[in-house]
Amino acid sequence: MDILLKERLVSYYEKHILEDVMPFWDRRCIDKEYGGYITCFDREGKMTDDKKYIWFQGRQLYIYSLLYNKVRKKKEWLENAKHGFSFLVKYGYAGDGRWNYVLDRKGNVLEGTISIFSDFHVLQGVAELSLIHISEPTRQAE
């Protein structure tokens, strides 16, 4: 791939993600009342469902943690990651290394451990969040 084309594509997607995609989610997904993330919206931003699918909770945790780790040390992204992690640990874990599939908005289990995708996305999110806590003391000491 041509270097100039690659740079233009990176610039385009970075701008789109940081100026369009993330502001859409930042304004809507943090559930300040019950914890975790509200993730079911239509393209106009209207909530279509308030169920909390654990795979999406894990994915959102991953995105906020990844943005903090790789793009910018934005305090809001770190707070949003910790916010989702707290909800997941409190309500999403089913035991024996498994995660529930879907909860109601308050965190009550609607469907238990039916999907390995829930397990995967939560582990991916937790792993990325853990990199923050492993590297932060080192960064502060530098």
Protein language model annotation of sequence segments:
Residues M1-I54, K75-H83, F87-W99:
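Low-complexity, Ser/Thr/Pro/Gly-enriched N-terminal "stalk/linker" regions
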Residues D2, K52-Y68, L78, I114-S130:
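Well-ordered alpha-helical segments within folded domains of soluble proteins
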Residues I132-E142:
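Single conserved hydrophobic/aromatic residue that forms the stacking wall/gate
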Residues K82, S86-V126:
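Well-ordered mid-protein domain cores that form the structural environment of catalytic cofactors
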